[in-house]
Amino acid sequence: MKISLFGYGKTTRAIAENLVDKFGPFDIYDDHFIETKKDTLGNLLLNPNDFDDNLSDIEIPSPGFPPKHKLIQKAKNLQSEYDFFYDIMPKSVWISGTNGKTTTTQMATHLLSHIGAVMGGNVGTPLAELDPYAKLWILETSSFTLHYTHKAKPEIYALLPISPDHLSWHGSFDNYVQDKLSVLKRMNECDVAILPKIYANTPTKAHKISYEDEKDLAVKFGIDTEKISFKSPFLLDAIMALAIEKILLDTLSYELLNSFVMEKNKLEELKDSQNRLWVNDTKATNESAVMAALNRYKDKKIHLIIGGDDKGVDLSNLFDFMKNFNIELYAIGISTEKMLDYAKKANLKAYKCEVLSKAVNEISNHLRVNEVALLSPACASLDQFNSYAERGKVFKECVNKI
């Protein structure tokens, strides 16, 4: 059986490295490969022009591999890593949505690791590196993965709210939503799907539990929010994690949940040498995440760094939302001019900075002790950085130099 891997990302590299003895050598296709070479394990590294669909039995893409790529268009036996590993996948919980996937996955694993749960997927560990004998896989599941998945399904599907994101990849918001909901048609009567109320009528055999907001979800599962130390925008993530625990174990471990430590890059607060507040929210790459951040600091004047790769999303609603705040904007990245245009139409004051270091320095000229400087860019980072984490790291380095 000849397996072709599309893209040389974390997912496909893990398959190539961990399964070469069982299924390899693999043919790995990536636009960065100009000449045919072999890696140290004997896998072939090939240019996409060399792909012959008649000589390939299975094609597995990296999750973010675009549907319009010529390899995807030519493939006849395409399947996601979820489909590829489904036959050995233990019971699983899939967590998706636009914002909060990572935090909810980490919180749920924190609550359930004592029963042998492990986490992976979009967060940290590819499926090829997960223990197939673990009691439970808790998988952060992206819309990219769901787009390519047609066989695998979880025992529990926890869907957080959906808002516009990755539209240039999916083609439209409706396509994005449909990919998020696609797994429901494969679930059966023994499975559970937790869904925003707006999607409550989506056909599925699974037992559906719909919710309107974090308060409603808490009521549905008998969760006392007063016992949870996390506040919005992380409260919904915490409630969802407890809901998953409730379904599986019929317990609610508030103390264990409250011992969870948030990861960096999400509303990460730091002070400069003048005791002024700066917030690293580099992971806020869409409008709903930025709205949540703005609401958190609504009682302060906000100096917002915004911009980057906007992924083809119309951010007009976000800028209309900003009219409710005492706010000044600092535009960066490839979308600088677009951000300035949005700001002008919304009658918001904005500075043309283009690069992050200049934005930090400009804010420093205006920021007062009772105000907040917020990096919550509403855009991806790859126009100027290798990752959102690198963007956050550079932001903190700039602040520490003040």
Swiss-Prot record:
Its Gene Ontology biological processes? cell division; cell wall organization; peptidoglycan biosynthetic process; regulation of cell shape
Please state the protein's primary subcellular location.
cytoplasm
Q: Which domain of life is it from?
A: Bacteria
Q: Where in the cell is it found?
A: Cytoplasm
Q: What is its EC number?
A: 6.3.2.9
Molecular function (GO) terms listed? ATP binding; UDP-N-acetylmuramoylalanine-D-glutamate ligase activity
Swiss-Prot/TrEMBL catalytic activity:
UDP-N-acetyl-alpha-D-muramoyl-L-alanine + D-glutamate + ATP = UDP-N-acetyl-alpha-D-muramoyl-L-alanyl-D-glutamate + ADP + phosphate + H(+)
Q: Which Gene3D superfamilies match?
A: Mur ligase, C-terminal domain, Mur-like, catalytic domain
Q: Where does ATP bind?
A: G97, T98, N99, G100, K101, T102, T103
Q: Name one GO cellular component term.
A: cytoplasm
Uppermost EC category = ligase
Q: Does the keyword Acetylation apply?
A: no
Alphabetical UniProt keywords = ATP-binding, Cell cycle, Cell division, Cell shape, Cell wall biogenesis/degradation, Cytoplasm, Ligase, Nucleotide-binding, Peptidoglycan synthesis
Question: Which Pfam families does the UniProt entry name for this protein?
Answer: Mur_ligase_M
Which pathway, metabolic or otherwise, does it act in?
Answer: Cell wall biogenesis; peptidoglycan biosynthesis
Q: Which family does it belong to?
A: Belongs to the MurCDEF family.
Q: Which HAMAP family match?
A: MurD
Its annotated function is as follows:
Cell wall formation. Catalyzes the addition of glutamate to the nucleotide precursor UDP-N-acetylmuramoyl-L-alanine (UMA).
Q: What is this protein called?
A: UDP-N-acetylmuramoylalanine--D-glutamate ligase
Give me the gene this protein comes from: murD
